[in-house]
Amino acid sequence: MRTRLNFLLLCIASVLSVIWIGVLLTWNDNNLGGISLNGGKDSAYDDLLSLGSFNDMEVDSYVTNIYDNAPVLGCTDLSYHGLLKVTPKHDLACDLEFIRAQILDIDVYSAIKDLEDKALTVKQKVEKHWFTFYGSSVFLPEHDVHYLVRRVIFSAEGKANSPVTSIIVAQIYDKNWNELNGHFLDILNPNTGKVQHNTFPQVLPIATNFVKGKKFRGAEDPRVVLRKGRFGPDPLVMFNSLTQDNKRRRIFTISPFDQFKTVMYDIKDYEMPRYEKNWVPFFLKDNQEAVHFVYSFNPLRVLKCSLDDGSCDIVFEIPKVDSMSSELRGATPMINLPQAIPMAKDKEIWVSFPRTRIANCGCSRTTYRPMLMLFVREGSNFFVELLSTSLDFGLEVLPYSGNGLPCSADHSVLIPNSIDNWEVVDSNGDDILTLSFSEADKSTSVIHIRGLYNYLSELDGYQGPEAEDEHNFQRILSDLHFDNKTTVNNFIKVQSCALDAAKGYCKEYGLTRGEAERRRRVAEERKKKEKEEEEKKKKKEKEEEEKKRIEEEKKKIEEKERKEKEKEEAERKKLQEMKKKLEEITEKLEKGQRNKEIDPKEKQREEEERKERVRKIAEKQRKEAEKKEAEKKANDKKDLKIRQ
């Protein structure tokens, strides 16, 4: 028995050794950041025809001027015009019914069932309550799949902008972007040496603090970035979420291939705002154990963060420039160039697609669009070398709401999510980049861009007589030219040129896609608002007049009551005086009677006269009292009616 057990253990050890040797032999250092460089069996583009037709896309960019002896340059001097080719978009399918079932099987989310409309079928529940967008992907060459994370939200009201909770779900797609439901990946965990079985779609186990009856819980803005792990590319999913006390929103990463290790990032010796988002991740080639982030573009601030405990140091910062716009809002995770090329020592270059947010431009109140960016490290310094104008890849961007036309809503939103893959596909140096993006917070799609590396390698900048030599791509790669003051000024100029061009783009976009209609709609909304304000003003004036009338009527009633009270008091005094006078007369008569003898008949007559006078006085008082009581009741009734 022991012999058999030893033999079995020996067999297992042999198999693991073969697997390990295979990993070492097949691992390629150039396979980094989601980029496959060999163009062989690990290529994401085995069948180029399956990508569809490529259409021309002209791109204008602005390149920094690195020459101190050049004159002050304008945007035209810094501009670079080139041509890219881009495919139509490919919308990524998502079986929300399948994903819903997975989510509801998890204990923490089981209460969601009670919030769904129970009268609906499952399909109808999905259509009413469940939404998805914001998919970010990377290609895993060793598995021949695209790994994508997307945001799935549940809304009890049936409104995507009013979620109860937000959940991150991982999916895999084949090379042709067909969703693989029920498929799995076996991943060798570098820390435990054990195989981790991952079935897809997969709900990432992120603590959400989901509470029934509360809103806006869960993870948002998922981004996936690749790093070089010990056994191959290792995807890290970055997101923002509320902390356990629900008072702060922070940046996190979760490692799906490392037992879902989750890290929250905190910046040392820095007072972080309550809400954090839009950090842009990237890795240095020689340091895959720490992640770097562009924290912000103005000020340009770069962080270096531990993947173990989340502690971050600010490793580079250029002070905020008040004159420089802050319309750059986040970017796709940055990746290196798709092939190893000679460059200066201790220098590194990344490509990314940041996004702009421009208000009140073109046919929308808010316009979001991608830009192309070249980001450079020289030693411990970082800077932006190139920015393009706004890109829309030839799309008619979905409206945020409205009747389906590009200019039928207040927002026009095209958000770049991630660079899925970038590789050289043939011996001629032709390259293809795949970009995932979202439109109108309601979709996830990919496009393929051809010739971006060639676009960059052919660029040239200022070539005036004062320049020592042209500012071309080879010069960017081979020289170290960072200078704090000059570089800051260059970045300010390049960003200013790019953002001015972006504003020109959105104006043109509006003119060609319904600016007149937008103006008409804005005018109608303005008239409607003015009418509402006028009606509100009239209503207020009417209420003030009514209030004034009631106050005046109240004063009249109070004045009348005062006069009546005074009259009653005067009559009371008069009656008292009459009574007193009568008593005096009676007393006088009685006194006279005692002093003289009076005839009994005369005495009886006088007594009867006295009684008659008393009776008349009493009768008069009674009638006056009844009259006053009747008048008082009538006045009280009238007063009550006025007050009502």
UniProtKB/Swiss-Prot annotation:
Disruption phenotype: Strongly reduces de degree of mannosylation of the core glycans and eliminates glycans resistant to alpha-1,2-mannosidase treatment. The keyword Transport does not apply. Keywords: Cell wall biogenesis/degradation, Coiled coil, Glycoprotein, Glycosyltransferase, Membrane, Signal-anchor, Transferase, Transmembrane, Transmembrane helix. Glycans are attached at residue 484. Residues 512-644 form a coiled coil. Residues 1-6 are cytoplasmic. The chain crosses the membrane at residues 7-27. Pfam families: BMT. The keyword Metal-binding does not apply. It comes from the Eukaryota. It is found in: Membrane. It is a single-pass type II membrane protein. GO terms for molecular function: mannosyltransferase activity. GO terms for cellular component: membrane; microtubule cytoskeleton. Residues 517-644 are annotated as: Disordered. Its main location: membrane. Its EC number is 2.4.1.-. Beta-mannosyltransferase involved in cell wall biosynthesis. Initiates the beta-mannosylation of core N-linked glycans. Belongs to the BMT family. This is Beta-mannosyltransferase 2.
